[in-house]
Amino acid sequence: KDTAPFLHSDSWLSFFGKIIMLQKPEDMELFPPEEEGYSYLIIFDDYIKLDLTILELDKFKEYQSADHLRKILLDKDNLYPQNIIPNDTDYWIKKPSPRSFDDCCNEFWNLTSYVVKGLCRKEALFAIDHLYLMRKELLRMLSWQIGFKYGFNFSLGKNYKFIDKYMETDHWLKFLSTYNNNSYNNIWNALFACQELFREASSCC
C-alpha cells in the first residue's frame, strides 16, 4: 500500500535480473510520463524487456479501467473481481463521425502545401517532417476505409502494425514507398503516392 520504500531505492529491481538499461519516465524532464504511477522501463542482460508501474491502491481501479487489455496476474489480497477478462475493445478502429472525417481530410490536404513549400525551397527536413504528419492522417483514413469494408470490431494493432493484412499488395507497396525520402525526387514521389492513396481511401468511406 505504501510505495515510498520502492521509490527510495532501485536496488529491489535487481531481484528480476541484471539490468543493462533502465528508464524512469517520472524522473525525466525531456520525456514526461503520460500516465499515473511510477514506471520503470527495463532491459535485462538476457534482452528481456519489462515495463513495470507502481501505483497507490486508490489509483489502480482507474488505471485498470483505462485499458481493458490489461490482465491481473496476481491479486493476493482479493481486492478486485476475479472475472475480469482482458479484451482489446479500447483499440478497435473507431468509426468516424462526419466531422472527424472532414477534419482528417482538411488536415491532410492542408499539410500538402507545407510539403510542397519545403520541396520548392530545397528544405528537405521541413518537407519530410510534414510528410510524416500527412502520413499519420493517411493511416487514419486507411484504417477507416478498412473499417467500412470489414467492420469496426477489431484492432489494427499499435502503430497500425497489422494494416498490411487488410490492404491490396500494390497499395501496401505504394504506401511503403512513401518512406523513401533520400532525395528531393523521392520526396515528391512520396507526396504524390500519399495523395493518391488518400484520395482513393477517402472516396470509399
How would you label these PLM feature ranges?
Residues 1-53:
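Metal-dependent nucleotidyltransferase catalytic core
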Residues 91-205:
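Conserved nucleotidyltransferase catalytic core and NTase-mimicking acidic/glycine-rich helix/loop elements
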Residues 4, 57-59, 148:
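Short, solvent-exposed loop/turn segments at secondary-structure junctions
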Residues 15-20, 61, 70-74, 147:
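Short, low-complexity, polar/charged sequence segments that are solvent-exposed and flexible
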Residues 26-39, 78-90, 176-187, 205:
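A short, terminal or domain-edge coil/loop segment
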Residues 69-103:
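A short, charged helix-loop
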Residues 20-26, 71-83, 131, 167-178:
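Short secondary-structure transition/capping segments
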Residues 37-83:
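Acidic, glycine- and histidine-enriched catalytic cores of nucleic acid- and nucleotide-handling enzymes
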